[in-house]
Structure formats: structure tokens, C-alpha cells
Amino acid sequence: MGDILSRDTLYEAVREVLHGNQRKRRKFLETVELQISLKNYDPQKDKRFSGTVRLKSTPRPKFSVCVLGDQQHCDEAKAVDIPHMDIEALKKLNKNKKLVKKLAKKYDAFLASESLIKQIPRILGPGLNKAGKFPSLLTHNENMVAKVDEVKSTIKFQMKKVLCLAVAVGHVKMTDDELVYNIHLAVNFLVSLLKKNWQNVRALYIKSTMGKPQRLY
């Protein structure tokens, strides 16, 4: 981490976000977001970056993943209670934009068997892709539960036209250490994507859904 982000600052901010929030118990599980503002970056000219990093603890426990599976995958999913759909169920949506949109809204991410993944644009049209939820490949030599966990704990940095971005790095029921570890991973990964690394970072904050932002950098 170097001297750039001090451990003390990080723990202090995390404590404030996690425990400052105990005064008010919310009805839902608040997410903790890392907010990044950039500098010396021209989104028009500079390459827009994107990248994914896997965190140690799942930032969003309620994150839902649906398997678009062949027979074997659907049977496996059924056995471990993972939401799944087979090719017949997808065909029934009949490329109806509204229904595909509804499906994309219902789940946070999708996994698909090899035999299905190539057919998805043909069966469903561009809906999942438009929603930024095109399925990741699920092969038969991967453990489905482990793969779903991996999807749940992976976050994506995507530079758009503006100079600030935000990603979920945890939630308020985490321990200080879990959250610090996740933030540390996320920040280091993000900085590695930037052209001039830390020289492109104007400020970093963490913030729970309803809480006040705490500055890290």
C-alpha cells in the first residue's frame, strides 16, 4: 500500500462508516461504496479503462446469480438451490424486449453453459448485453457453487465519460478487517489501471448507503 494510503486512515474511516452507523439501524443492509474521483484524465482522449477484481469477502450478500444451463447444469443448480433456466424457458420469452428486460432486472448476473452461451443473442436478442449482464461462461469442470461465489465477490471498474466512479466494496455487517482488506484490494487494483497511477487520483472516499462519506485520500 506504500505510504500513500495509511493503514490508520483506512481503519479510522472504516470504523466511522461501520460503527458511526450503529446509532441508526436501517431496515436493509447498507452497502459500503468506494468513491473515486480522478484528475489529469481526459475521458475523451485517454483510453477508458475497465477491469474486474475479486474481493476477499462478498460485498453484496443479496447479489443474485442465475444459471442459464444445459440439462446437467440445471440439475446441478436445482440440487444446490441456485436459480436456473433451461433453453426452453429462454425460448418462451420469445425475444420479447419487455420480458428479456424483466429477466435482466431480476438477477444481478448470469452464468451460462457452453452450449447455450453462443445461442443467447439469437434466442434473447441484445437485452442482457444492453443491461451489461451478458452471462459469463460456466464449464463442466468448474464447481458451480464456487463459480457463483466468485461472481458475487467480483467488482468491476468502468471508466465512463465522467471523472468519478463508485463500486461496492462491502456492507455494514462486515468486520473492520474484512472491509479494510476489500478496500485495500480494490484501491490497489484501480490504481494499477490508471495511466499515471496515484497521480490520477484526486480523492477517495468510502460511504455507506445512508452514511456520510469518509475521506481516505
Swiss-Prot record:
Gene Ontology MF terms in the entry: RNA binding; structural constituent of ribosome
GO terms under cellular component: cytoplasm; large ribosomal subunit
Cross-link (Glycyl lysine isopeptide (Lys-Gly) (interchain with G-Cter in SUMO2)): 118, 161
Residues modified as N6-acetyllysine: 91, 106, 118
Cross-link Glycyl lysine isopeptide (Lys-Gly) (interchain with G-Cter in SUMO1) placement: 118
Places the protein is found: Cytoplasm
Official protein name in the record: Large ribosomal subunit protein uL1
Swiss-Prot/TrEMBL GO biological process terms: translation
Assembly with partners or alone: Component of the large ribosomal subunit.
Species of origin: Oryctolagus cuniculus (Rabbit)
Function according to Swiss-Prot or TrEMBL: Component of the large ribosomal subunit. The ribosome is a large ribonucleoprotein complex responsible for the synthesis of proteins in the cell.
